[in-house]
C-alpha cells in the first residue's frame, strides 16, 4: 500500500495552521505537491515555500499565513468536464466567495477559475479554503 503524499502534506499544513505555527516542513515531496503549493501561494493562502533537494527524497518548507481553514486531497481522481466545474465547486466549497478547487488539466495544474477561463476539464486533485 502506497502513501498518499499530497494528502499527508495538506493534513500537515492544516494541523500546523491550527496549532499557530509559522512554518512547516513537508517530507517526502512530489512535483504535484509543489504545483498545488504554487497555486496556494498565488491565491494568498501561504506566504512562500522553498523546495530543498528536489531530485532525492527532498523536503519543502512552507511559510504559513494563517488563512488556511481546511484543505484536502481526493484519494480518488474524479473526472470533471469544463461545464461541470462550477457545479462541482458549489458542492465542495463552503461558499462561492472563497476557496479553490485544484484540477489537473492538459494545460497543467490549475485552479477552477483558470480552468473555466481556458474551458478545459480534467481530474480533481483537491481543494482548499
Curated annotation (Swiss-Prot):
A biological-process GO annotation:
translation
Q: Indicate where this protein is primarily found.
A: mitochondrion
Keywords on this record? Answer: Mitochondrion, Ribonucleoprotein, Ribosomal protein
Under InterPro entries, the record lists:
Ribosomal_uS8, Ribosomal_uS8_CS, Ribosomal_uS8_sf
Q: Report the SUPFAM superfamilies cross-referenced here.
A: Ribosomal protein S8
Q: Does the record's keyword annotation contain Plastid?
A: no
State whether keyword Glycosyltransferase applies: no
Gene Ontology, cellular component aspect? cytosolic ribosome; cytosolic small ribosomal subunit; mitochondrion; plant-type vacuole
Any one Gene Ontology MF annotation carried by this entry is: structural constituent of ribosome
Q: Which family does it belong to?
A: Belongs to the universal ribosomal protein uS8 family.
* Oligomeric form and interacting partners: Component of the mitochondrial ribosome small subunit.
Its recorded name reads: Small ribosomal subunit protein uS8my
Gene it is expressed from: RPS15AE
Amino acid at each position: 500500500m502506497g502513501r498518499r503524499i499530497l494528502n499527508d502534506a495538506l493534513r500537515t499544513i492544516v494541523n500546523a495552521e491550527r496549532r499557530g505555527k509559522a512554518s512547516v516542513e513537508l517530507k517526502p515531496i512530489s512535483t504535484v505537491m509543489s504545483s498545488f503549493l504554487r497555486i496556494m501561494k498565488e491565491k494568498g493562502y501561504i506566504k512562500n515555500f522553498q523546495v530543498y533537494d528536489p531530485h532525492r527524497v527532498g523536503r519543502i518548507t512552507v511559510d504559513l499565513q494563517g488563512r488556511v481553514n481546511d484543505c484536502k486531497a481526493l484519494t480518488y481522481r474524479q473526472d470533471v468536464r469544463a461545464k461541470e466545474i462550477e457545479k462541482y465547486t458549489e458542492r465542495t466549497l463552503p461558499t462561492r466567495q472563497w476557496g479553490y478547487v485544484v484540477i489537473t488539466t492538459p494545460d497543467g495544474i490549475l485552479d477552477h477559475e483558470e480552468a473555466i477561463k481556458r474551458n478545459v476539464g480534467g481530474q480533481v486533485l483537491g481543494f482548499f479554503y
